[in-house]
From Swiss-Prot:
Keywords: ATP-binding, Coenzyme A biosynthesis, Cytoplasm, Kinase, Nucleotide-binding, Transferase. Its main location: cytoplasm. It comes from Shewanella baltica (strain OS195). It is found in: Cytoplasm. GO terms for cellular component: cytoplasm. InterPro entries: P-loop_NTPase, PanK, PRK/URK. This is Pantothenate kinase. SUPFAM superfamilies: P-loop containing nucleoside triphosphate hydrolases. One of its GO terms (biological process) is coenzyme A biosynthetic process. Pathway: Cofactor biosynthesis; coenzyme A biosynthesis; CoA from (R)-pantothenate: step 1/5. It catalyses: (R)-pantothenate + ATP = (R)-4'-phosphopantothenate + ADP + H(+).
Length: 316
């Protein structure tokens, strides 16, 4: 059986942290410590040095790739004798629960906005495309939330298709982590951005992963560049438990929170419940649906202790 390391060696160029940081090539740091504080997720300790070493080289790479795509688009438009199209460059960010996808997405959005070639960068999370809570309960999917079948994939594909085709105003549903549900009558409007960052658990899936219909379009069909944020599962489980403890005294303390009943748990009780949620929901979803898509990504960001990036793998 082919090992993970041999597959990655065949498909990717591997960079140690120091090697990758040297590819920054004098790109200026445009974020302050306060900016970074506003971008951090729960239980993340990301520093400006992490931005400098990892994210600035990545923003430079993406800028070069987007510019090349824009130039190619102009050539095609000239060949066809048509006006320049407004199709955005779409970047997807995938990975496990608690790995830090959202923080990675927010930092990249902030950095990419500072490049003059693509100042308009929108960010959409796939959480909003989860079926409403009532539908999940009716379908018996509440304990499968986050699994592929818990998403309204038809709505998500229609959204990403409309954005990709250059429609002027496309609405995406908004998700509340307080109510654990879609927010009724509220939407995020995406209006012809230069770049759209799409962040979610299952954005790398293809027809190979669907036992139902391998012929229907998938989100990955519309993505130009994909990133997978990776870490070993014991670290992910620990980060999830730590985040759960922070939510207990934070978001869960809100009386409107779906998980308000967790706010009075002791540390031991909270750790036990978080571990059980991981073992029965998040862990199996990672093993069955998320991790198997990792080697489809154009770039893998490998995290170690304290959420620090240790390696970067880039498709050959």
């Amino acid at each position: 059986m082919t090992s993970k390391n041999s597959i990655q060696k065949a498909l990717y160029l591997a960079f140690e942290r120091l090697q990758w940081s040297e590819l920054r090539d004098s790109v200026p740091l445009t974020l302050s410590e306060q900016d970074l504080e506003n971008l951090r997720g729960i239980n993340e300790k990301i520093s400006l040095s992490e931005v400098t070493d990892i994210y600035l080289p990545l923003s430079r790479l993406l800028n070069l790739i987007v510019k090349a795509k824009q130039q190619r688009g102009l050539v095609v438009d000239e060949f066809l004798g048509q006006k320049p199209s407004r199709s955005p460059y779409i970047i997807s960010i995938a990975g496990s629960v608690a790995v830090g996808k959202s923080t990675t997405a927010r930092i990249l959005q902030a950095l990419l906005r500072h490049w003059p070639e693509h100042p308009k960068v929108d960010l959409v999370t796939t959480d909003g495309f989860l079926y409403p809570l009532a539908d999940l309960k009716r379908k018996g999917l509440l304990q499968r939330k986050g699994f592929p079948e818990s998403y309204d994939m038809k709505m998500l594909v229609e959204f990403i298709s409309a954005v990709k085709s250059g429609q002027p105003h496309v609405k995406a549903p908004i998700y509340s982590h307080v109510t654990y549900d879609r927010v009724k009558n509220q939407h995020q409007t995406v209006s012809q951005p230069d770049i759209l960052i799409l962040e979610g658990l299952n954005v790398l899936q293809t027809g190979l992963d669907s036992p139902v219909d391998t012929r229907r379009p998938f989100v990955s069909d519309f993505v130009d560049f994909s990133i997978y944020v990776d870490a070993e599962e014991p670290l992910l489980k620990q980060w999830y438990k730590e985040r759960f403890l922070q939510f207990r005294s934070g978001a869960f303390s809100d009386k409107k929170s779906y998980f308000h009943h967790y706010s009075t748990l002791t540390d031991d009780e909270a750790n036990t419940i978080a571990a059980n949620i991981w073992d029965t929901i998040n862990g199996p979803n990672l093993q069955l649906n998320i991790q198997p898509t990792r080697e489809r990504a154009h770039l893998i960001l490998q995290k170690g202790q304290d959420h620090l990036m240790s390696h970067v793998l880039m498709r050959k």
